Amino acid sequence: MEIKINHELWMDSRVAFQSVAEFHFEWMPNQHAVLEVDGYTDRDILYGKETIYDSKIRIWKEQNNETLFYGYVVNVTEEVAGRLKHIQIKAESASCRLDQNPKSRSFQAVDQTYAETARKAVEDSGGQIICTEGNEMPIKKPVIQYGETVWAFTRRLASHLGTCVVPDITSGEPALWFGMRNGSAIPPFSENEYTIQIARTEHGDGKQTETGYETESRAYYKLGDKVVFGGQRLHIYGVSARFQHGELIFRYLLKSRADYAKLYQEQFTGLGLTGTVVDVRKEEVQVALDIDGGKTTGEYYYDWYPVTGNALYAMPEKGARVEVYFGSRDEQRGFGGECFLNASDYRDFYIFRQLNAVNRSRINLFDQNVYFSGAEKNNLSLSDGYISMGNSRNLEISSRKNIIMGAKKVVVIALDELNICQD
């Protein structure tokens, strides 16, 4: 329902507001923009509170139909006061839709750039993206989205380039900028009154600082817009707006640049991801990870470091099941380290095993039988049902004491002569 807030502002939401007392929103890099609205409606009006959650809300200026905020309601509270209901709405930019469903997948096409990787992640989740950074920088090694939302993953990718992500707040669609928004040049602000901020950067040895300037205006500008202030070329790195007592005032944070700490997915330390070997090259393996549904996502070859060390190891073959390990929180330092068999392979392995010696002697270990064979066709076969011995020449059974043969039937066969002697 549309409501006119004042002579220049309109709001559209599912709440049948009779009046809006105040609202404010904040728009900063690396976080969803947040809007909070305080308003009143008649207590007898039923607006279906349960339908408000996850519904859209938009605020715009009547002149030029310029949108100030367009997002989704994430929280609603109400309080009855006489004949009125006091309703408070909290909403977030539509980028929050990209921050709801954690996923796991890998990006192993290492010749692709950071921008291309971020674009694929966002667009595969139904979002939109504009890349102002990372268009020339290849990822070089695989990056992995592990138990992360698309928003968290792209934010982490951006931090590897020393930049940020910026949510879109005007389209009402899940969209973002990868890198600071490339804004327009705007008229200078008044320098009669402003605040200077000096703060330590988020990373480093604590000695680095960054300086920002806060100033107010009635005009609406956007993140990334450029302005000359105090003789310096600055950019807008923060926008906040407050409507109160019928007046809308914007407050801007101006900086020449911003430093962003490199972010990691901490769960990678000690993690192992299983997959299937697709190809082997010297002491490297190409792996289709299970988190990708067993499909290859690039042609990267992981180094193979067996758990046995450098001695007595063999490279896994195509189709073998292996595990890719991560010794730190940096997923770009993964390596293949263990090859294992599935349940059916284990059974096949134990059903038939064979050891061949250089002199042609052989030991066969079967499921129901153990067989020993010498180079001269001597053999011994042991099973649950019988024992068999054979020799192509002489077969001698000797003992220092007694030899006892006991059975229901004993058969001794000789082609030429049978001698049983006593010394």
Model-assigned labels for residue ranges:
Residues 86, 93-95, 133-199, 333-340:
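Short beta-strand-centered interaction patches in the first periplasmic/extracellular domains
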Residues 230-237, 242, 246-360:
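Exposed beta-strand/loop interface patches that mediate assembly or binding
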Residues 54-56, 224, 319:
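Loop/turn positions that initiate beta-strands
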